[in-house]
């Protein structure tokens, strides 16, 4: 019986910890693009039980680029973003993300990057896009302007 447990002990304990949106201490989502008018980065971070929001974005040629850092946001605003993370199961998606084996670089292509920092210091990164998350982040950015 011990011989059967040994392989399980050696190989079965590599499961990733299951995190929830309550474990998030920072989230960042960005789009890089060759077009300066269609790029953005949003970051929400928790410090001493308060939430702070950074944004740097532009969506068209007619409106100026918006940039700000460390805007204090309400717990409700932070909760709306974390709810989108929870509803879309973005933490698990990011944990399951595997970068492509073939490294191809397209000069005019954009890239989407999602980053989480958890309360225990674990960092989770993925190149994934989620429209719902973009919408709640953009809504908060417009509110903070």
Regions found by a protein language model. Give the residues of each.
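Short, well-ordered, aromatic-rich surface patches in folded extracellular/luminal domains
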Residues: 13-34, 95-145
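A short-motif feature that recognizes glycine-rich, charge-decorated loops
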Residues: 57-93
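Solvent-exposed, well-ordered amphipathic alpha-helical segments
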Residues: 46-50, 87, 109-112
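Polar/charged alpha-helical tracts
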Residues: 18, 42-43, 47, 76-83, ...
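Short amphipathic beta-strand/extended segments with alternating polar/hydrophobic composition
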Residues: 41-45, 67-76, 121-131
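N-terminal export/targeting and maturation segments
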Residues: 13-63
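Phosphate-binding glycine-rich loops and adjacent basic patches that engage nucleotide phosphates
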Residues: 37-49, 74-77, 95-106
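Sec-dependent bacterial lipoprotein signal peptides
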Residues: 1-11
């Amino acid at each position: 019986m011990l011989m059967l447990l040994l392989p399980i002990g050696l190989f079965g304990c590599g499961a990733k910890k299951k995190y929830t949106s309550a474990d998030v201490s920072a989230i960042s989502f960005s789009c890089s693009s060759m077009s300066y008018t269609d790029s953005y980065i949003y970051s929400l971070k928790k410090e001493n039980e308060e939430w702070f929001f950074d944004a740097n974005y532009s969506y068209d040629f007619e409106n100026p680029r918006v940039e700000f850092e460390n805007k204090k946001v309400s717990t409700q605003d932070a909760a709306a973003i974390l709810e989108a993370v929870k509803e879309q199961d973005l933490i698990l998606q990011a944990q399951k993300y595997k970068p492509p084996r073939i490294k191809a670089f397209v000069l005019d292509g954009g890239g989407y990057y999602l980053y989480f920092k958890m309360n225990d210091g674990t960092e989770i990164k993925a190149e994934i896009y989620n429209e719902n998350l973009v919408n709640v982040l953009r809504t908060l950015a417009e509110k903070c302007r």
